[in-house]
């Protein structure tokens, strides 16, 4: 009976710890009458600083015969270029390589920062820090950038004829075609946000149950999932841009 009671108490304690795992507490700056979402700004600036630092280090001493570090950077650039060319097409892809590359690298580093950097160790007066993509504001902003990009691409390539796609194959589908242009990138943002948030919550729950062993495989799985989510977002963003210039679904 004593052992059973101890087991029950231990189980209740574990359940209490799990119930205390929160979706996230945000850190805000109060500037006048405006409440600024500081958590996203701080972590986004850190991610941008990491990317800029890596870019400076990678291009500081370029060699005709590339070193191992230069080889890696060239491989990443070639990967992004091939991804963009595959989705947009041989003739139109070059101007869009920087945009797709920026999207991919920002999301990739943001996702990995959530898995590798101990954001929550940094104590704040209130709230907590987390990966930028762990916040719906960031992923929706990326979705809106994608929307602006493919609207611009379609109008730049096809002019006012771009709007003709909304009444194809029949004008009856006009509302659905308009709605589709906004739901496609938003679905990307919700998928990215949901996957990153779920990964962090699963790791937090497992750490509360088995602090040492079990979370490690989940963290490696989280790194893999984070990379896949960055690839999916960049690939579909490029596909939407290519689709807008081609003028068909």
From Swiss-Prot:
PANTHER family for this protein: ATP SYNTHASE SUBUNIT A, CHLOROPLASTIC (PTHR42823:SF3)
GO MF, one annotated term: proton-transporting ATP synthase activity, rotational mechanism
Cellular component GO terms held in the UniProt record: chloroplast thylakoid membrane; plasma membrane; proton-transporting ATP synthase complex
Keywords: ATP synthesis, CF(0), Chloroplast, Hydrogen ion transport, Ion transport, Membrane, Plastid, Thylakoid, Transmembrane, Transmembrane helix, Transport
InterPro entries: ATP_syn_F0_a_bact/chloroplast, ATP_synth_F0_asu, ATP_synth_F0_asu_AS, F0_ATP_A_sf
Family listed: Belongs to the ATPase A chain family.
A Pfam family hit: ATP-synt_A
Cellular localisation: Plastid, Chloroplast thylakoid membrane
UniProt key word Plastid: yes
Predominant location category: plastid
Membrane topology per record: Multi-pass membrane protein
Protein's UniProt name: ATP synthase subunit a, chloroplastic
Gene that encodes it: atpI
Membrane-crossing residue ranges in chain numbering: 38-58, 97-117, 136-156, 201-221, 222-242
Role noted for this protein: Key component of the proton channel; it plays a direct role in the translocation of protons across the membrane.
Subunit structure as annotated in this protein's UniProt entry: F-type ATPases have 2 components, CF(1) - the catalytic core - and CF(0) - the membrane proton channel. CF(1) has five subunits: alpha(3), beta(3), gamma(1), delta(1), epsilon(1). CF(0) has four main subunits: a, b, b' and c.
Superkingdom of origin: Eukaryota
